[in-house]
Structures are given as C-alpha cells and as structure tokens.
Amino acid sequence: MSLENDAAAPPPPPLPPPPPPQPPSLARSESSKKKLYQALAEGRTAVEGDYEEASIIIGQRESSFSKDLQWLLFNNYVPSLIQDGPQCGLVALWMAAHLLQPPKTLLLETLVQTAKDNGYTEQGEMFSASDMAKLAEDVCGCRVQRLSGGMLGENTAVILKHLINRQPILIPYDEDFNHEPCLRNGHKAHWAVASGILLGLREGCVNYKHFPPDITLPWLRLAQSEASVSWPIDDIEEVFVLAKQGKSLRYQLWEFESVAQSNKQLKEMDPQRASDGTRYVLPPGGVQDGLAGQVLLLHTNTEQTKN
C-alpha cells in the first residue's frame, strides 16, 4: 500500500449539531405540567379575614341585592390550598379542619395517606360522601353529620343553622369552568367547603345589636361571634353560600338554589375519565349513590365530641 493512498483517505464527517432544546411545555413531564388554575394561583396569596374578601365580592355585585331586604353575612374564614391532581375533596376537608376547636395541625399528606390506607381513594379522588365522613371523624376527631336527600326541603333549615353557627359544610357538586355550580350529571364532580352564608331577610326581622354595618357597604350587616339568631325560615327571602374549593385561592358567592340543584344531579363519572386507564375508587352504586344529594356538616368542637 502506497503512502499516497493513505494520505488520500477522507477525514470523518463532523458530528451533527445538538438538537434545539424543547419548548418548556414539552420539556416537562406530563406529571409535572401545571394546570391553568395552578399557574393562576402561583405567586398569589389569599385575602384573609372573615369578611374582607366577602365584602369585596358582594360590593362588585351590589346592584343584584335588593335594598328592601335586611342583609346579614356570617362567615368563619378558612385558608386556601390549591389541589395537585384529583384531591378536591381532601383539600376541602383540609380547609374545613382549620376551624377545629381546639385547633389542630393537619397535613394534607396525612389525609391523602389515611384515605389510601383505608381504601377510600387511589389518586386522591373521593366519590363517596360516606367515606369522606368516616375520614373526617377519624383524622379530625370531630362529629360529622351526613345529610342525604338533597339540600332543599327539610334539610335547608339544618344547613342554614349550621352555617349561621359558623360551622363548615362539605358539598359535592358539578364544577363549571369558572368553578361555579353547573349541571353536568356528575361529569365534573368536585368538592367545596362552605364556611359562610349571606341571608336576605324581610325588613324588620333583625335586631341589629350584634350586626355592625360593613365599612364600605352600610346596608350589609356582619355577624359577630356572639350573635344569637332565631327567625322563621319563611322570613328568609334569599340565600347565598360563601365557599372555597381547591382550584382557586378566592372565595366565591353562590346562590343556594344553584348549589342545591348541582348537588342533587350527580349521577355518573365522566365516561372519558372512567375509560382513561387510571384507577379510581367508586362506591357501590357509583357517583349517584356516593355523592348525589349529600352534604357533610362538620361539628368542629372536638371537646364536645369526646364528651
């Protein structure tokens, strides 16, 4: 072999340039992608206080409240927590647990793990109000009253009294795109915690002794902790619930009738979700038997529960 032939051998081709980096939305794994509601909440904080945020919400809708009625607002502030995955029920319970007396520190991870250990959930979902009640009693140590048959009729007075007494209620409902109640047959089943109530009563029903006016809305009266109330339910013309859920830091004000209708029609799991290959825990009778027409009233004084 000649030296000339060796010198004529071509050099190896250069290595190809590295591929461009993936866009951030593709570089993240599916499990770490942020949902829109998580991105919206990032870097923000909730408005704290029993009445601060509620007053703002009511003020933004002031024209929709008849000044011919006496308006009373009751609320016991619960903190906000943004859910990660289908944890709406456990997050709602975590919020409500902040009203326990005496106070008790409760980690969301404890709720999730206890629910899994008891076979109530696989992914954090809670499709059984009965299981949710047992979980709350077990972990929170409080008494839980589970109502069935819907939020209207005889149950209305029970629910109103509970909220007037500044006690939380866990409500399953169908969640619309703006987190408000809607009617989707259970395909958007979600949990919220109601910690307050706004009542519009007939003129002359209320002694304002324990109901000072709101600073910015003098027609709105705020219940003090020692307020004692007892009116016939027929004197109540309008009812709104003040609620939070795990996809927003903010309180929302919902018409009681709207929540009741949404709660009543929870019939089935979203077929697309049911067939996506993910394991979920469904009670016998499915969503309809597990959630429809049911709410949980948490009695937060755990000392009374022990007695």
Curated annotation (Swiss-Prot):
Q: Name one GO cellular component term.
A: cytoplasm
Disulfide bridges in this chain: none
Q: Which PANTHER family match?
A: ACTIN MATURATION PROTEASE, UPF0692 PROTEIN C19ORF54
Q: Name one GO molecular function term.
A: initiator methionyl aminopeptidase activity
Name of the protein in question:
Actin maturation protease
Q: Name one GO biological process term.
A: protein processing
Region entry Disordered, spans: 1-34
**Subcellular location field:** Cytoplasm
For this UniProt record, give its keywords in alphabetical order, as a comma-separated list: Aminopeptidase, Cytoplasm, Hydrolase, Protease
Q: What is its main location?
A: cytoplasm
Broad EC category? hydrolase
The encoding gene is: actmap
Compositional bias, Pro residues, is annotated for: 9-24
Region span, Peptidase C39-like: 80-200
